[in-house]
From Swiss-Prot:
Botulinum toxins are produced as progenitor toxins of large molecular sizes of 12S (M toxin) and 16S (L toxin). M toxin consists of a non-toxic, non-hemagglutinin component (NTNHA) and the neurotoxin. L toxin consists of the M toxin and the 3 subcomponents of hemagglutinin (HA). HA is composed of subcomponents of 70, 33, and 17 kDa. The 70 kDa subcomponent undergoes proteolytic processing and is split into HA-55 (also called HA-53 and HA3b) and HA-22-23 (also called HA3a). Preliminary crystallization studies show a tri-lobed HA-70 where each HA-70 contacts one HA-17 molecule. Its main location: secreted. The gene is HA-17. Gene3D superfamilies: 2.80.10.50. It is found in: Secreted. This is Hemagglutinin component HA-17 type C. SUPFAM superfamilies: Ricin B-like lectins (SSF50370). Pfam families: Botulinum_HA-17. This protein can also be encoded on a prophage. GO terms for cellular component: extracellular region. It comes from Clostridium botulinum C phage (Clostridium botulinum C bacteriophage). Keywords: Hemagglutinin, Secreted, Virulence.
Length: 146
């Protein structure tokens, strides 16, 4: 897997699940989940390319000093620390990406995976799991530029 830059312009995005095609990544009450679309800032994500690291960082528009990061248990959460917050979006189709962990690309590729509870991803965690699969719709996200 290459860690070359995927071209994505800096700016605000909504992150939509391809699995449901109608649910968006939402930050609410200290937790991340997927819910129906709204115009609130808690569903808007600022994407910023960090050239010194050749990776991208996501921050929530409602909480601009917090970043999407992963912990040792594989959970993706909003953190006030920039540790473990660099990502490599791999484009697989128009506006469709698998988002991999930048720090461990070329070792075992880890990617965002939406936990699926009987075909219902509402209020389910987002995990950083090994072995991404372009055929796994739980790992494919649409980035909609605002």
């Amino acid at each position: 897997m290459s860690s070359e830059r995927t071209f994505l312009p800096n700016g605000n995005y909504k992150i939509k699940s391809l699995f449901s095609d109608s649910l968006y990544l939402t930050y609410s009450s200290g937790a991340l989940s997927f819910s129906n679309t709204s115009s609130l800032d808690n569903q808007k994500w600022k994407l910023e390319y960090i050239s010194s690291s050749n990776g991208f960082r996501f921050s929530n528009v409602a909480e601009p000093n917090k970043y999407l990061a992963y912990n040792d248990y594989g959970f993706i959460y909003l953190s006030s620390s920039s540790n473990n917050s660099l990502w490599n979006p791999i484009k697989i189709a128009i506006n469709s990406y698998i988002i991999c962990t930048l720090s461990i690309v070329n070792v075992t590729d880890y990617a965002w995976t939406i936990y699926d509870n009987n075909n219902n991803i509402t209020d389910q965690p987002i995990l950083n799991l090994p072995n991404f699969d372009i055929n796994n719709s739980n790992q494919i996200l649409k980035l909609e530029k605002l």
